[in-house]
Amino acid sequence: MYYEWPEASEAYAFRNQYLFGDDILVAPVTAPGKEGYATVKVWLPEGKWYEWQTGTMLDGGRTVERTFALDEYPVYVRAGAILPMYGDTVKNLNANDEEILLTLFPGGSGEFSLYEDNGDDKRYAAEFARTHLKSVRNGNLLTVTVGKRTGAYCGMPAERKFSVKVLASAAPASVTVDGAKADWTYLGEEFALVVEIPRTDCAAEKVVCIRYEDAEVD
């Protein structure tokens, strides 16, 4: 934490916390709990953060206290983050062409560089591919771009399907993928919007445009 916030005293005081990548804050439970529950104090740096378990957006610059069950994790995600995730069916990354779910945490624009290799040897330093992911919010328009894949590795898939999941979202007025009207699903219990990008060439850029009735949907 103190590498990212060297001038904040809390970064030194909360010694068990750490960042996983640029946008995920983890606060492990390190003390015994009672009857399957543990109370954890977490320091949230300045900015907006989403609690992973509940999807609640919290203001940073303060300490929060929360009780977690054994099957819950004190994990917080920075607002604006894009997190790519594989499905539950992935057994290994070699020649993996499974769908990738891009989960967006609203609160501003965000970027992510998706790195992939064959996951089966030591050539990862020289043989790999990257896909640039970007989300931009401008008024009532949210634009998500899946960039052209660059680089190469043995066995990489030529095509892939992506899905975009926007958390804390209202139902949209319209959705397009590469300029064409697209189907979408609204998960009312999660307040989340899901847009599927058809399986396409990984060397081609894909652009999702989500337009809302209201500019203030975050």
Which stretches of residues belong to each language-model region?
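Short beta-strand element of the conserved SAM-dependent methyltransferase core
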Residues: 76-78, 133, 184, 207-212
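Exposed regions on extracellular, virion, or secretory-pathway luminal proteins
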Residues: 75, 177-180, 215-217
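Surface-exposed interaction regions enriched in Ser/Thr/Asp/Glu
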Residues: 198-218
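Surface-exposed loop/edge segments in extracytoplasmic proteins
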Residues: 57-59, 173-176, 180-184
